[in-house]
From Swiss-Prot:
Keywords: Cell inner membrane, Cell membrane, Membrane, NAD, Quinone, Translocase, Transmembrane, Transmembrane helix, Transport, Ubiquinone
GO biological process, one term: ATP synthesis coupled electron transport
Record text on subunit structure and interactions: NDH-1 is composed of 14 different subunits. Subunits NuoA, H, J, K, L, M, N constitute the membrane sector of the complex.
Source organism phylogeny: Bacteria, Pseudomonadati, Aquificota, Aquificia, Aquificales
NCBIfam families: NDH_I_N (TIGR01770)
Superkingdom of source: Bacteria
EC code(s) of this entry: 7.1.1.-
A UniProt-annotated Pfam family: Proton_antipo_M
Protein name per UniProt: NADH-quinone oxidoreductase subunit N 1
Length: 464
């Protein structure tokens, strides 16, 4: 057995045990040390990916390692690293230095890495649940705050609903095909079709697509802001890599699946963007933005095309970078006395914190899809991919939804730069980790916009 193939997961598992054991003996004041240690293990795990021998299959062909899922793991670890660095000062200022937090992020990340390497529906379920259960805990960490408890409960309910649908869908696929291992299916029947629809629905719920989005904004709003950054990015990367794999295997035998995905995509794009205009909280606005982006991403799954898939995976990654950057700025601002993320708090922010206002504006422009931000190329790639695969009408709807979204992002920027603040919140401290995350994500969003081939070429080769 090629044990080298699971080197990234093994390093992360060692990191979890190390941080867990140290947390038992160290006082809360060493929380920063545990966060940095967890970050080091994330870096080591990411570095080890370059030494993995692939392709490889392990555990009775239920776990595979290939170029595509190694890229997915690298993306997941990169974004997790940024979240870890940005979180320790935030929780210190909130007097919530939970020693469990660093290894909870690692456990969720390990589950997602196992999930995208799985070629067996049962192992996918195991990885998915390892990540999901950990994320329920992360949402409810501010247990003294009502919104955090409410968000955790709601996230638990919607998460277990998705789990139930996935389990039943997998059982139906197994009943119709006689195997839990993913392989090209040539024939469909009623049981298989129903199983595929349930699996699509379960994963759509996990990525917060309409109509499975209910309570997602509440969970995002109630969670600690660095946790919201994690929830809205890292699991999405894992889910869309899994979606691509399932599209190439299971869904190819069910030709009508694309209409199900198309419906979910259109509903998510327009609902998320329209309802975002009614929000008074910028944090909640970004939650609805993530629902709209789920719709954008799902449009790329309506056809089996490597160029569409490569644009999707590139888009998901750069969207994650921009979103983590935006939420990190919100986390920094939240440390101010009386800050609530209400639009009124952002009035005249350029006068109090010109650098933070400028960085947040950059991330919001990136999410709109304005060049040279890399998100623009992701959107452009999906649009041309839809046109190329004769999905012209869907491509037009995709473009219209993107234009609609510009308004609410620009509203935040207008409040920051064109209005004068009525309430002064004063300056705030920025930790080294937060500064590195904001500057690092901003640099990568622009860098990949100018040099997209650095990532796209690897994804295209992996898909080929």
């Amino acid at each position: 057995m090629n044990w080298n193939a699971i080197l990234p997961e093994a390093i992360l598992a060692i990191g979890i045990l190390t941080v867990f054991i140290l947390e038992l003996f160290l006082e809360r004041k060493h929380y920063k040390f545990l966060s940095v240690l967890a970050f080091i293990f994330v870096v080591l795990s990411g570095y080890s990916i370059f030494f993995v021998n692939y392709p490889a299959k392990l555990f009775f062909d239920g776990f595979s390692v290939d170029a595509l899922n190694l890229i997915g793991k690298l993306f997941i670890l990169a974004v997790t690293g940024f979240v870890l660095l940005s979180s320790y000062d935030y929780f210190s200022k909130k007097n919530s230095q939970y020693g469990e937090l660093p290894y909870l992020y690692l456990i969720a990340t390990l589950g997602l890495m196992v999930m995208i390497s799985s070629d067996n529906l049962a192992i996918i379920f195991t990885g998915l649940e390892l990540a999901s259960i950990t994320m329920y805990i992360l949402v409810g960490l501010f247990r003294r705050e009502y919104l955090s408890k409410e968000g955790a409960f709601k996230y638990l309910v919607i998460g277990t609903t998705g789990t139930s649908m996935y389990a039943l869908g997998s059982a139906l696929v197994y009943a119709s095909s006689g195997s839990m291992v993913l392989s090209p299916v040539k024939e469909e029947n009623t049981l298989f079709a129903l199983g595929v629809i349930l699996i699509i629905s379960a994963l759509a719920l996990k990525v917060s697509a309409v109509p499975f989005h209910f309570w997602t904004p509440d969970a995002y709003e109630g969670a600690p802001t660095p946790t919201t950054a994690y929830l809205s990015t890292v699991p999405k990367i894992g889910m869309y890599f899994l979606f691509v794999k399932l599209t190439m295997y299971l869904f190819s035998a069910f030709p009508d699946w694309k209409y199900v995905v198309m419906l979910l995509a259109v509903l998510s794009m327009f609902y998320g963007n329209i309802v975002a205009y009614a929000q008074k909280s910028v944090k909640r606005l970004l939650a609805y933005s993530s629902i709209a982006h789920a719709g954008y991403f799902l449009t790329a799954l309506t056809a089996v095309d490597k160029h569409l898939f490569s644009a999707l995976l590139f888009y998901v990654f750069v969207y994650a970078l921009a979103t983590v950057g935006a939420f990190t700025v919100l986390a920094i601002l939240e440390k101010k006395e009386g800050w609530t993320h209400h639009f009124l708090d952002f009035k005249g922010l350029k006068e109090e914190n010109p650098v933070l206002a400028s960085m947040l504006a950059l991330f919001l422009f990136a999410l709109i899809g304005i060049p040279p931000a890399a998100v623009f190329l992701g959107k452009l790639g999906i649009f041309f991919g839809l046109v190329k695969t004769d999905m012209f009408a869907l491509g037009i709807l995709f473009a219209i939804a993107s234009l609609i979204s510009a308004g609410y992002y620009l509203k935040v920027i207008v409040y920051m730069f064109l209005y004068s603040g009525e309430v002064r919140h004063g300056q705030t401290t920025v930790s080294a980790g937060e500064a590195f995350t904001v500057l690092g994500t901003a640099f990568l969003v622009i860098f990949f916009g100018l040099f997209p081939h650095v990532v796209l070429d690897f994804i295209l080769r992996a898909l080929s």
